[in-house]
Amino acid sequence: MTNKTWGGRFKKSLDSGVNQFNASLSFDHVLFDQDINGSQVHVKQLAKQKILTEVESQAIYSALEEIRSEIKQGQYSFNVRDEEDIHMFIEQLLIQKIGDLGKKLHTGRSRNDQVALDLRLYTRDKGCLINELLTRLIDCLDDLTSKHQQDLMPGYTHLQQAQPVTLGAYFNAYQCMFGRDKSRLEDWFKRMNYSPLGAGALAGSTLPLDREWVAESLGFAGIIPNTLDAVSDRDFVIELCSVAAMIMMHLSRLCEDLILWSTQEFNFVILDDAFATGSSLMPNKKNPDVPELIRGKSGRVYGHLMAILTVMKGLPLAYNKDMQEDKEGLFDTINTIIACLQMITPFLQSLTFNTLLMKTKAQSGYLDATAILESLVMKGMPFRDAHHQVGAWIAEAIEKQCSLNELLKGG
C-alpha cells in the first residue's frame, strides 16, 4: 500500500520520477481559490443532505478558509512534493489541521468533477476580467472615433494609398472588431456557465447529492446533465482560447498599423516617451516595443489553441490524464491576453497623431480617383469606360507630375 490517497490497491510506492512527471501542483496551484470555493459549497451540501453533520461541515468549511488565507499570505511553496496537484495539496493541509474529519471532504466527489468545476470557475472569473478590459478598450476607441471623426487620412489596400477616410472611421473599424469579440466572449459565457460537480468520476454517485443546489450556490445557470460529458468536456477551454486568439489577432493588426505609422516614413504617430524604448547602441532610436510585443504574443496564444485542440482530438470518453495538458496553455493564454489588454488602452491614450500630415497625404496623390470615376458614372458614362478614362488621366498626371484636379482644370 502506498501513501497516496488512491493507494489502497497498490503494493509499491510510486516511482519518484513518475511522481514528478505526474504532478501538476507547480502550475495548477493558481486554482486554489476556486478549489476552496467549490469544496466549501460541497461540504455545505453534504450537511444539507445529512451526509455530514452541521458541526462537521462547519469545521471543514472554517479550516478551508484558514488554508485560503495562509496560501494568500504565501505560507506554502508549490514545488513538486508528495501531493500531485492543488486538490490533494489542500486536502492534505485540511487533514493536518482537523485530523480524520478532513478525510470526509472528498465524500461524493472525484477529482474528475472537482477539476472540471475548478476550471469552469477559474475561466468564468478570468472571462469576466477579460470582458471588463475589452469594454475599456472599446470605450477608448469610441473616444478616439469621436475625437477624430473629421480628421482626413489616406485609406489603404495592399498597403497602397486607396481612398480618403477619416482617422475616426479607422478607430471605429477596430471598435467594431472588438465589439464582436466581446459578443463572442459573452456567448461563450452562456454555454460554459453550467456545473459539472456531482458527476463523480464519470457516472455520478449513489449518495443523495443535490447537484442543482450546488450549481445555484456557485452561481451557475444549471447543471451539466450528462455525467460523462460533465467530466470529459473541455469545449469551454477551447472556446475561450479561440476567442482569445481572435482578440489577439485584432490587437496584432491594430499594433501593426501603429508600428508602421510611427516610422519616419509614415510619421502619422508620435510615441509617448513613457511607452517607448531606446537602443543600447543607437541614440537616435525610439522603438515601439509595446505594440511589437503585443503583435508577437499573438503567436503564443495561437499555439496554445492548437495544442489543446490536438490534445483533445483523440481522447475516448471520459476523463484521461492527457487532459492535465489543458491547463498550462490555458493559464498562459489568459495571462497573456489580460496583460495585452491592460497595456493597449493606456498606450492608445498616450499617442499623438499627426493629423495635419495625414490630411495632406489624403488630399495629395490620386486618392480622389474613385470619386471622379463615380461622378462620370452619374453623368451616364458606363462604369468600365469611366474606369478606363480616369486610369488614363492618372497616367498622364503622373507623367506631368501633377494632381488629377490640376490636370483636369488645365484641360
Curated annotation (Swiss-Prot):
One Gene Ontology cellular component: cytosol
GO MF annotation terms: argininosuccinate lyase activity
Pfam families (alphabetical): ASL_C2, Lyase_1
Entries under SUPFAM superfamilies matching the protein: L-aspartase-like
Catalytic activity: 2-(N(omega)-L-arginino)succinate = fumarate + L-arginine
Domain of life: Bacteria
Cross-referenced InterPro entries: Arg_succ_lyase_C (IPR029419), Argininosuccinate_lyase (IPR009049), Fumarase/histidase_N (IPR024083), Fumarate_lyase_CS (IPR020557), Fumarate_lyase_fam (IPR000362), Fumarate_lyase_N (IPR022761), L-Aspartase-like (IPR008948)
GO biological process: arginine biosynthetic process via ornithine; L-arginine biosynthetic process
PROSITE patterns: FUMARATE_LYASES
Record's subcellular location: Cytoplasm
Keyword annotations of the record: Amino-acid biosynthesis, Arginine biosynthesis, Cytoplasm, Lyase
Family: Belongs to the lyase 1 family. Argininosuccinate lyase subfamily.
Protein name, entry field: Argininosuccinate lyase
Organism of derivation: Legionella pneumophila (strain Corby)
